[in-house]
Amino acid sequence: MKEAVVIWAKRTPFGKYGGALRHLEPEALLLPLFQNLKQTFPEVMDQVDDVVLGNVVGNGGNVARKSLLEAGLNHRIPGITLDRQCGSGLESIIYACRMVQCEAGKVFIAGGVESTSRAPWKIKRPQSVYEMQLPQFFERASFAPEGQDPSMIEAAENVAQHYNISRNDQDLFAARSHRLVATHFNNGDINREIVPLTIKGALFDRDESLKPNLTEARLHRLRPILPNGTVTVGNSCMKNDGAGIALIMEKEMAVAMGIKWGMLYRDAVTTGVDPTLLGIGPVPAVSQLLKRQKLNIEDISAIELNEAFSSQVLASINELHLGLDKVNQWGGAIATGHPYSASGAALVARLLNLPNWQYGIATMGIGGGMGNAVLFEKWRQ
């Protein structure tokens, strides 16, 4: 079996829903990433075997194929778009690594893209031309059967109650996320994973959801979204627009090209959980992954866990017995935002640029009651 390495991973800055990137379709969000990749590795672009992208709320079609053509990649390169809800971007990278392992190709571009601002409205199709009722709009697709398909907020509250996560702890974690992201933007760390955009003549190079001066006191003053709840707009992620991609290739090829460092793909797990507790997906995914690789949680020195809600991150940390110092060391999606399919690629880009680790995991809870997790090992020649 061949070995797969991630040698490059970047993302755009993330825009707020209805914010600075609201006018950009998914293909336009991906364009600067493809351009940066072509400039960095021009010698491999004609050797790409496939482009694998996640996308959840787009307008259909094959975003991967359309975006690679719009970016000027060779028309002989195919594209495939995957949908595993918000885990789609991470799943696309896992898919590409496995394709390299089984010798189905040597070079893949994988990641995800999402424009919540440009997502089309969906309405129920009338069964007859004589129907007189007003159009019924769908806020989102159903993830599970009726009675097992809570809203994201309800699911986050379910997790908070089931795992005894307090409002105070959720707010403290949210403040930590904003504080860490602001710190690592200011010292230049996070800039290494970002390809800036030019929007209406102005440079857009920082996540729009970030609130660098957010304090615990301000978070404590926010009202819960649900009556008697603990989840607020402050201790949850926002809806966002953005993209992220990675370049994955066979290790032997990377060595022959003189590439000096990257991340070696070790293994990945995707599993299901109770849909009413969907945010807890990282717990069984990471547990199964460690068991398969005969590792302990103490062997993992960096974990990037998508921050959809403070409640599910804290529940996952507690259940996995993680040290907080290993988790989201530069902050996470509560501060940077969560553009669904792009988030998994962002976790991988963060791991690639994060220093001082040997084994690292990227993991996500997924709509419909799932979780995925991927294990990388730092690789240097």
UniProtKB/Swiss-Prot annotation:
Protein's UniProt keywords contain ATP-binding: no
SUPFAM superfamilies with a match to the protein in the record: Thiolase-like
EC identifiers of the protein: 2.3.1.-
GO biological processes: fatty acid beta-oxidation; phenylacetate catabolic process
GO molecular function: acetyl-CoA C-acyltransferase activity
Record-linked Gene3D superfamilies: 3.40.47.10
PANTHER family per UniProt: 3-KETOACYL-COA THIOLASE, PEROXISOMAL, ACETYL-COA C-ACETYLTRANSFERASE YHFS-RELATED
Protein name per UniProt: Putative acetyl-CoA C-acetyltransferase VraB
Organism: Staphylococcus haemolyticus (strain JCSC1435)
Gene name per UniProt: vraB
